[in-house]
Regions:
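Beta-lactamase-like hydrolase cores
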Residues: 25-53
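Active/ligand-binding-proximal structured segments within catalytic/core domains
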Residues: 83-92
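Beta-lactam-recognizing serine transpeptidase/beta-lactamase-like catalytic domain environment
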Residues: 25, 47-48, 53-80, 93-330
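A short acidic/glycine-rich loop-to-helix N-cap element
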Residues: 328-339
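Sec-dependent N-terminal signal peptides
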Residues: 4-13
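Boundary at the C-terminal end of the N-terminal hydrophobic targeting segment
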Residues: 17-21
Length: 339
């Protein structure tokens, strides 16, 4: 993963040529330097790099690669599990609903076991509060608190109401459905809802059944474009424009500011957790003094795991948000996967 963090540092500190597979109907918002850098670093890999200008929703990099060559559908039309990058959205939801506070602390002993369910976690210090749980990407912290939200019978009349509330937050951040960008082939992904879960588990589900969604696995998928837009919503502390790639658009869909459902006060601790991830957490491989806020993700998968990363910079008045998603990356010998 080190080389992908180096890539991100280059993208985030860098600031109209059309790459193969991009639209050809008019001038694009893509920046040649970023696009060429992304394409070069994806050679020999299957994955995508998306960058968006948070100020206006313009897509400034949409680099992709597949075994058959570049294909924008890799970034916009192939929903996959987001892994631990999704913990940012979970934290925002849990804070907004009052399930946790920034000071909520939890022990983690390399994971958690409950009956026949076991979820592992990498070694880190413990207990952790919210910002440290983000920085260290603690699975236990997020799955237990997510499960607590779904099972909270005092705040919600039923688990159906709880999951519907959770889903509404995620949808407000641009997840769970197509955003209707101006590129053909967009897919929306999956956010488990009450109807879906009742069909799948025949009503025999609760917060523990769907623990995996708490850390971005299981019944949740999204595209790299959606992950980049999630980073945009955090960078802007609660708003975004629908991403678009055609310059000087007059379509109001792309000129209308959209607000998330997240409480304004929830953003500060999440931004701080992402800053700490780069400074002393799972993203320290970036090795930069530039004020980057980021979140790593490892996606468990048959064979080699996938790797993901979202980031924005600078921390205040951000100019760029980035998402990287690489399938089956091969870390250098002796380097473990980041969470």
């Amino acid at each position: 993963m080190i080389r992908y963090f180096i890539l991100l540092a280059a993208l985030l500190t860098g600031m109209t040529v059309r790459a193969q597979g991009l639209p050809t109907d008019g001038p694009l918002t893509v920046r040649p330097i970023l696009q060429q850098l992304g394409e070069r670093l994806l050679k020999g890999k299957t994955g995508s790099i998306v960058a968006i200008n948070p100020e206006n929703g313009e897509i400034i990099c949409l680099a992709t690669n597949t075994p058959k060559g570049p294909d924008v559908r890799q970034a916009i039309g192939k929903p996959m599990a987001p892994g631990s990058t999704f913990k940012t959205a979970q934290a925002l939801t849990l804070l907004s609903e009052g399930i946790v506070t920034p000071d909520t602390r939890m022990e983690c002993n390399n994971g958690i076991t409950d009956g026949n369910i076991k979820v592992g976690c990498h070694k880190h210090r413990s207990p952790l509060n919210l910002t440290d749980a983000l920085a260290q990407s603690c699975n236990t912290w997020f799955i237990v608190n997510f499960g607590s939200m779904i099972n909270d019978s005092f705040m919600y009349e039923s688990k159906d109401e709880a999951i519907t509330t959770w889903r509404s937050y995620m949808q407000s951040m641009g997840l769970g459905g197509p955003m209707h960008i101006d590129i053909a082939g967009e897919q929306g992904g999956l956010l488990a809802g009450a109807d879906y879960l009742n069909r799948r588990y025949k009503d025999g589900w609760d917060g523990k059944t769907i623990w995996w969604a708490g850390m971005g696995q299981g019944d949740v998928t999204c595209t790299p474009l959606q992950l980049c837009n999630l980073a945009v919503t955090i960078a802007n502390r609660g708003w975004y424009y629908v991403p678009h790639i055609h310059r000087d658009t007059q379509n109001q869909r792309y000129l209308t500011k959209r607000q998330t459902k997240v409480a304004k006060e929830a953003y500060a601790p999440v931004v701080e957790g992402m800053r700490l991830a780069v400074e002393k957490g799972t993203a320290t491989s970036i090795k930069t003094s530039y004020p980057i806020c980021g979140k790593t993700g490892t996606i468990e998968n048959p064979g080699e795991d996938h790797s993901a990363f979202i980031a924005f910079a600078p921390m205040n008045n951000p100019k760029i948000a980035v998402a990287v998603y690489v399938e089956h990356p091969q870390p250098p010998r002796g380097e473990g996967h980041h969470r």
